[in-house]
Structure formats: structure tokens, C-alpha cells
Amino acid sequence: KAHSRIYRLTANEQKSHVLKPAAIPTNSPEIQNRLNPNKNHHFRNKVYNTLYTDTRGWTWAGTPDGLELFTSENDSAPRIFYRENGLSNNFIQGIIEDKYRDIWVTTSNGVTRIHINPENKNISFTRFNQLDGALDGEYIKDAVFSSSDGTLYLGGIDGFSIFHPDKDSIHPMLPDPPVFTA
């Protein structure tokens, strides 16, 4: 549980110790810097569902409202991508990289593959939905996995999708339907 107060331990007249609230707000920048001196300033006071650093050293930050991209430690501000840019949905659940250095993003409504052109660093988006073989609906926070052969497993509420980068295809894995017997 996060606390909104800082407490100070003081001795009273009976020489016993008393814990009293101090009149210092914990959300002040000075207190945050003292509590988290080595924390990157970009990530303070924000809500992130998932963070992923790819093989380029770029950090992708999934938020409830878009995908942020930090390409270096010196970035003054991240690039931010939304549904209008090509994401399936703005609520980012998971991020993973495939063996071809494409970034896969699971959201609250579908999957997006992000391709970065190695020559000019241009970014393009490909959405996958139920018609492409992806699960319909919401994916689960950080339910992404890459196996040793490069296969990606993307977990959703109703099962998971399997992506084989070599075949450029995505396959849903749904739970087995119930079997009724008499």
C-alpha cells in the first residue's frame, strides 16, 4: 500500500519514542528524488502496464493510454503511439520482440506488430484481429512469451495466440469446448 505521509520518530518527555506524521508531502519532487535517486525521470509519477527494452536498447512503455518509445537515455520526451498511428487499441497489455526484431504489442482489443526499418528507422504497424487468427478481445497484462525456437505466445482472457515468425502467421489456441455426455 502506498502511503501519502512521511513519519518522524521522536522522543517525548518520558524518553519513549513516538511516531508522528511529518508535514512533508510525499509527492513533492524533492522527496521523490530522495526516495528514488537512480530512477529514470521519464518513468516517475506515471502508470505503466509493461516495460520492455528491445535488442536496439530502445525502451517501450505500455500505458493505459498509448505506447511510449524511448530511443535513448537522453530523450527529452518519448514518441507516443496511439490507435490512430496503427495500434489495435490504446490500452497496452504486453510487449515482446521476435527474432526479426519486430515488436509485438498486445492490447485490450487485439495484437499489433511493429516493424522498424533498419535503414531509416521508420516505424510501421500491422494490426491482427480475429479474421487474421488472433484471439478476439482482451489480452492479459504481461502474458507474452518467446520460446527457444522463436515462437511467440500471446495470452488473452479466452486463450492464447501463437505466432510463428518464419511462417508470418498467427494461430489462436482456445480452451477446449465442453463435452456433454449422458
What are these regions (language model features)?
Residues N12, T55, E73, K99, ...:
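Short, ordered coil/turn segments that flank beta-strands lining enzyme active or ligand-binding pockets
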Residues G62:
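N-terminal/domain-start segments enriched in small and hydrophobic, helix-friendly residues
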Residues R8, E13-H17:
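Surface-exposed loop/turn elements that mediate protein-protein interactions on large endomembrane-trafficking
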Residues K1-I6:
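Solenoidal tandem-repeat scaffolds enriched in leucines and small polar residues
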Residues K20-N49, D65, S76-I96, Y100-A182:
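Residue-level "micro-hotspots" composed of small/polar
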